[in-house]
Amino acid sequence: MAPVSALAKYKLVFLGDQSVGKTSIITRFMYDKFDNTYQATIGIDFLSKTMYLEDRTVRLQLWDTAGQERFRSLIPSYIRDSSVAVIVYDVASRQSFLNTTKWIDEVRTERGSDVIVVLVGNKTDLVDKRQVSIEEAEAKARELNVMFIETSAKAGFNIKALFRKIAAALPGMETLSSTKQEDMVDVNLKSSNANASLAQQQSGGCSC
């Protein structure tokens, strides 16, 4: 196995309104679990995972951002050096879908076209409460020239597919000729303290 230090690193920033499931998607991907107890993300959380695929390996740095308005001023600094922006909405919340336009605009303002943007419709398990059709979301993705996928962090639906889709789109990935393992985990869990304004916040973890 190639040493971790040799891996190319890619920064993924998760953006979207509060309670759309950004943290739940990350938690399902990292640990294959789902927490029904909702706790809002405070500021920015950071985790990393090394993915070993059939012919390549990548180190994904996952930055989980708070959706609350009071933390919006912190987000541009995390977007600026990102490789991927994952814009999440709740398929049962039309407003969260409409708001993805401003999230994408914010990413494009900071990064131009030099970033991969993925639109993610989460909570597909809420079948009876769906307010956004897959056809409408696909049309928006085409219009804005971004990738698109629907997921359910609760059911574990399409979570691995989301990250495989991202990995396949990343430039300059290293090739492993002999590695056949998949989804081996190298976890580093931190809470960012780069912003003094977060020092007064009490972090209760994040589960959504």
From Swiss-Prot:
Gene3D superfamilies found in the cross-reference section: P-loop containing nucleotide triphosphate hydrolases
GO molecular function: GTP binding; GTPase activity
Tissue spec. comment: Expressed in roots, stems, leaves and flowers.
Binding positions for GTP per the UniProt entry: 16-23, 64-68, 122-125, 152-153
Function comment: Protein transport. Regulator of membrane traffic from the Golgi apparatus towards the endoplasmic reticulum (ER). Binds GTP and GDP and possesses intrinsic GTPase activity.
Impact reported for C208S: Loss of targeting to Golgi
GO CC terms: cytosol; endosome; Golgi apparatus; Golgi membrane; membrane; plant-type vacuole; plasma membrane; plasmodesma
SMART domains the UniProt entry points to: RAB (SM00175), RAN (SM00176), RAS (SM00173), RHO (SM00174)
Residue numbers bearing the Cysteine methyl ester modification: C208
Subcellular location: Golgi apparatus membrane; Cytoplasm, Cytosol
NCBIfam families: small_GTP
Keywords: Cytoplasm, ER-Golgi transport, Golgi apparatus, GTP-binding, Lipoprotein, Membrane, Methylation, Nucleotide-binding, Prenylation, Protein transport, Transport
Membrane topology: Lipid-anchor
Identification of the protein by name: Ras-related protein RABH1b
Short name of any one Pfam family annotated for the protein: Ras
Assembly, per entry: Interacts with the C-terminus of GC5, but not with GC3.
Stored SUPFAM superfamilies: P-loop containing nucleoside triphosphate hydrolases
Motif placement: Effector region: 38-46
